[in-house]
A protein has these predicted regions:
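Glycine-rich phosphate/adenosyl-contacting loop at the front of the ribokinase-like
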Residues: 1-61, 66-73, 77, 244-245
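Structural alpha-helical scaffold elements that stabilize or flank donor/cofactor-binding regions
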Residues: 127-128, 174, 210
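A glycine-rich helix N-cap at a beta->alpha junction
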Residues: 74-89
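Conserved phosphate-binding/catalytic region of the ribokinase-like
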Residues: 2-5, 169, 199-282
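Conserved phosphate-binding/catalytic loop of the ribokinase/pfkB sugar-kinase fold
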Residues: 61, 87, 97-134, 139
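Conserved beta-alpha-beta core of the PfkB/ribokinase-like small-molecule kinase fold
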Residues: 134-204, 224-226
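Alpha-helix C-terminal capping segments
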Residues: 46-55, 99-100, 261-265
């Protein structure tokens, strides 16, 4: 029985600035606080799946530096298998996150070692893919590596979940190979060339995307919830109402939890309902 999740993607050392508002152009603005955290979409997603109890493996690169050591140590602490993380000469990837009091975030990432991932790294994990039920990908490593990983995952019989974030052009033939495409409203607007600013527009867009570009898709809508579309049907899943302290990583938690739920036999709607609860308490 295949019971593993393989996450291929990014590991970043995050600097999180707690601020009351974004500074104006040319303005120097004091942050209220600063925090340092292990991050990167790939690593965050892997940690959530591992915390829920799924055997989870991370494939990616970090630098031969202190930040890289921290990221590997943190992943191990939460149960992520790290033997497929390679150390390279490039500096470890970094994220700078501006976190506002209302829970919204504005982030910038430095590619660093994440763009050192090669086809050989994917080939090295070939046996692992054959034992994995799901491969999770994001868009924080080179696109050609993602496409190669999709091909290898499908050859190995894995279900592929692609978190198309940050949004970038993807050849349609590869989108159609993806089993589940996950985007937020900004990324959805990028691919549909149409603004997604209401739940109804999200439902319409998800139906369009699942019909034209991929097999199934999930639109995450922040505090509103999410929309799931597949096989010509669409469902809206409202968020769990909590007081948002800071939402960094909530979307990644959602994806890791979705992987867990799918491995445990839930259909996609039930999986997203489960993941919604997990991301609310991240």
């Amino acid at each position: 029985m295949r019971d593993k999740i393989t996450v291929i993607g990014s590991l970043n050392y995050d600097v999180i600035l707690k601020i009351a508002r974004l500074p104006e152009m040319g303005e120097t603005f004091h942050a209220d606080d600063v925090a340092f955290s292990a991050g990167g979409k790939g690593a965050n997603q892997a940690v959530q799946a591992a915390k829920l109890g799924v055997p989870t493996y991370m494939v990616g690169c970090v630098g031969e530096d202190a930040n890289g050591e921290i990221l590997i140590s943190e992943a191990k602490k939460y149960g992520v298998h790290t033997e497929y993380i390679r150390k390279v000469q490039e500096p470890t990837g970094m994220g700078v996150v501006n976190a506002l009091q209302d829970g919204s975030v504005f982030a910038v990432i430095v590619k660093g070692a994440n763009y050192a991932v090669t086809k050989e790294d994917i080939d090295h994990a070939e046996d692992l893919l054959k034992e994995s039920a799901i491969v999770i990908l994001q868009m924080e490593i080179p696109q050609e590596i993602n496409m190669y990983a999709i091909d290898k995952a499908k050859e190995a019989g894995c279900k592929v979940l692609l978190n198309a974030a940050p949004a970038a052009d993807i050849p349609e033939e590869y989108l159609k190979k993806v089993d589940i495409l996950v985007v937020n409203e900004v990324e959805a607007a990028y691919y549909l060339h149409s603004e997604i600013d209401t739940i109804e527009k999200a439902k319409e867009g998800a139906l369009q995307m699942s019909g034209e570009l991929c097999n199934a898709c999930i639109f995450t809508l922040g505090k509103e919830g999410s929309v799931v579309a597949q096989n010509g049907e669409v469902a809206f899943i409202p968020s769990k109402k909590v007081d948002a302290v800071e939402s960094t990583g909530a979307g990644d938690s959602f994806i890791g939890a979705t992987g867990y739920a799918l491995i445990h036999g839930m259909d996609l709607v039930k999986a997203c309902e489960f993941a919604t609860g997990c991301s609310a308490i991240t």
